[in-house]
């Protein structure tokens, strides 16, 4: 990725890959490091559904300006971790949720090995906040802090949506693009956007 100008400083940007826990997909990850400043810590971003790490570049540059190294991966089925457009939104044929969590933990392990002397934080948004919450609960002490935004909690409609989702996947396959599911999960959000893609 090279260098970025931002926040009045140079920022070194690197992109690399590692093998997903699903054993098939290459996961793209990114590191933005401020150049020539005292480092205060590492912040790993776990993005939301229908997103990718590069959507957070401006925010990452801001954090670099404060002395933080920022990293994140494109989750399975997102960004450069979706090799073909057909793969967008698809995690894996089996245990995709666990692969998603393991992939975020893999980046944590990579970064902590490089920067073990720095405080380490995870920031998760939406789906990424659920991943962050699971990692914090499964691995106490792994992170020095956790920030969640746009997270969710138990809701009576979740059970209905899960049954409908499972029924569609069972009858049409795990890569089915369902307008009904899109409307159920994103309808209220998409109504707020004129001409959503």
PLM segments and residue spans:
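Alpha/beta-hydrolase
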Residues: 46, 73-75, 149
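N-terminal cap/lid segment of alpha/beta-hydrolase-fold proteins
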Residues: 2-35
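Glycine-rich nucleophile elbow surrounding the catalytic serine of serine-hydrolase chemistry
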Residues: 124-134
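Alpha/beta-hydrolase fold nucleophile elbow
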Residues: 115-126
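Active-site glycine-rich loops that stabilize anionic/oxyanionic intermediates
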Residues: 43-51, 126
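Conserved alpha/beta-hydrolase
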Residues: 53, 58-86
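Alpha/beta-hydrolase active-site loop
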Residues: 92-112
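Alpha/beta-hydrolase-fold enzymes
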Residues: 132-197
């Amino acid at each position: 990725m090279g260098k970025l100008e931002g926040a009045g400083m140079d920022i070194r940007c690197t992109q690399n890959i590692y093998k997903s826990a699903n054993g098939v997909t290459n996961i793209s990850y990114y590191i933005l490091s401020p150049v020539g400043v005292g480092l205060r810590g590492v912040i790993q971003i776990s993005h939301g559904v229908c997103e990718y790490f590069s959507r957070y570049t401006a925010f990452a540059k801001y954090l670099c300006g404060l002395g933080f190294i920022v990293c994140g991966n494109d989750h399975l089925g997102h960004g450069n971790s979706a090799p073909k457009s057909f793969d967008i939104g698809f995690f894996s044929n089996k245990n995709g949720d666990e692969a998603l969590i393991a992939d975020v933990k893999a980046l944590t392990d990579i970064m902590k090995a490089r920067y073990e002397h720095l405080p380490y934080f995870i920031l998760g948004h939406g789906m990424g906040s659920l991943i962050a919450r699971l990692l914090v609960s499964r691995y106490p002490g792994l992170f020095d802090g956790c920030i969640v935004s746009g997270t969710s909690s138990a809701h009576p409609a979740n059970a209905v949506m899960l049954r409908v989702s499972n029924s569609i996947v069972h009858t049409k396959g795990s890569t089915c693009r369902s307008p009904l599911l899109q409307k159920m999960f994103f309808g209220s959000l998409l109504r707020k956007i004129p001409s959503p893609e």
